[in-house]
Swiss-Prot record:
It comes from the Eukaryota. It is found in: Secreted. The keyword Heme does not apply. InterPro entries: Defensin_invertebrate/fungal, Scorpion_toxin-like_sf. Gene3D superfamilies: Knottin, scorpion toxin-like. Keywords: Antibiotic, Antimicrobial, Defensin, Disulfide bond, Immunity, Innate immunity, Secreted. This is Defensin. Disulfide bonds join 4-26, 11-34, 15-36. Belongs to the invertebrate defensin family. Type 2 subfamily. It holds the Pfam family Defensin_2.
Length: 38
């Protein structure tokens, strides 16, 4: 979701809109999941 697996920057920008999150990346077996980090 949120751009994954093809557009990791979309995932990153999505996570930046979440309070307390500094970014995100695609994770999981096929990079299908957008994972946010602090």
């Amino acid at each position: 979701g949120f751009g994954c697996p093809l557009d990791q920057m979309q995932c990153h920008r999505h996570c930046q809109t979440i309070t307390g999150r500094s970014g995100g990346y695609c994770s999981g077996p096929l990079k299908l999941t957008c994972t946010c980090y602090r």
